[in-house]
Structures are given as structure tokens and as C-alpha cells.
Amino acid sequence: KNVVVIGAGYIGVELAEAFELKGKKVTLIDAEERIMAKYLDKEFTDIAENEFKSKGVKLVLGEKVARFEGENGKVQKVVTDKGSYEGDLVVLCIGFAPATKIVQGKLDTLKNGAIIIDEYMRTSREDVFAAGDCCVVKYNPANEERYIPLATNAVRMGTLVARNIENPTLKYMGTQGTSGIKIYDQCIASTGMTEEVAKATTN
């Protein structure tokens, strides 16, 4: 009856909507002050937040989860640094991390474990290619390597591995981090940096 979704990125937001449409009482918690703060500017997250509020979804923003409480192996409450919220189901949507332990010490990676590749999808080891959410991507707006796990990136990279594995000729052009989401009747898309990030980057 009471569902708590922790993490208000794309997946958390989509799950919150899905549970609400199924008639559940939904609480959406995030440490950021806005939902989807890493992807969208405030003028757009305000629209999305108002949609949720109009549907009765409780938004708990700017709070960090401290612990879960319950009895007999069943969760009953989520406790944050500022309050507590009832929930008989808790879903964690707190981001991705590359599952690359198998290549630790064998391939060059970022600190988070994302495999570093060149423009042909080649790793630091000869004849070893990599693609998808385990890898870094060239982020064109900042002209740097970043970890951006998106299905669109993964599909392109997989195609490039297939094309280049015998004879590397087709270069990866990089990504703008383009993504989109539909929240109830609102369709929102973004590409490149948010205004906030762009200002911080140029300063």
C-alpha cells in the first residue's frame, strides 16, 4: 500500500509514477533539492514536481536516508536525517556503478571502475574491446571522458565494437548525453549540460 522510492533520477521518477498509477501511496525521496536535478534545469523539474504533487505523490527532497526500520524481516519505515516515512515496500534507485571487478588490475579504468576506451572501443589491452554501461564515453559538451550509462550510448558502442573488432575504421563520435522522459502528460527531453553545470564549467 505504501511505497517508498529512494532516488529521484529517471528510473526513480518513472517507478514513482508507475506505482501511483497502480493506486499505491507513493513517497519519493532524494538527497538533492529537486527531482532529476542532474539532468534538467529547475524550470523543467518544477513542472514535473507539480505533476507529482497533483497526483498525491509525496516528494521528500533534500533528505538523506539513514536507515530502514521494521519487524520480522519486513520493512515498515524509512528514516532520513530529517524525518521518517511509512513504507511496506522500498525501492532503491540510487544510480549505476560499472560492474567491472573482473577486469580490475587488467584494464585501465576510472576510479569508479568504468573502463577507459579509445575512439574505436579498444581498451588498454590489445585485442580487448568494451562497450556499454561498463565504459566511459566521450562527453562532447565538456570535451572529456565521463561515465554516462544510457541505453542509447550502449547501443551505439556495441555496434561500433562489431564494426571495428576485425579492422578498426569507424570512430565513436561521442555523446551529448541526450535523454528524455514522459511523466504523466508531460514529455521532457534534454541534451548537453544543464544551465547550472554549464555556468560552473565555464567559470
Model-derived regions, located:
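Glycine-rich Rossmann-fold phosphate-binding loop(s) that bind the pyrophosphate
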Residues: 6-11
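Aromatic pocket-lining residues of Rossmann-like dinucleotide-binding sites
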Residues: 19
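Mid-to-C-terminal Rossmann-like scaffold of FAD/NAD(P)H-dependent oxidoreductases
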Residues: 134-203
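A Rossmann-like FAD-binding core segment of flavoenzymes
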Residues: 22-117, 169
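FAD-site-proximal beta/loop scaffold in flavoenzymes
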Residues: 1, 72-77, 84-164
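A structural signal for isolated positions on well-ordered beta-strands in alpha/beta enzyme cores
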Residues: 4, 27-28, 129
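Short, conserved glycine- and acidic-residue-centered signature motifs
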Residues: 12, 41, 150-154
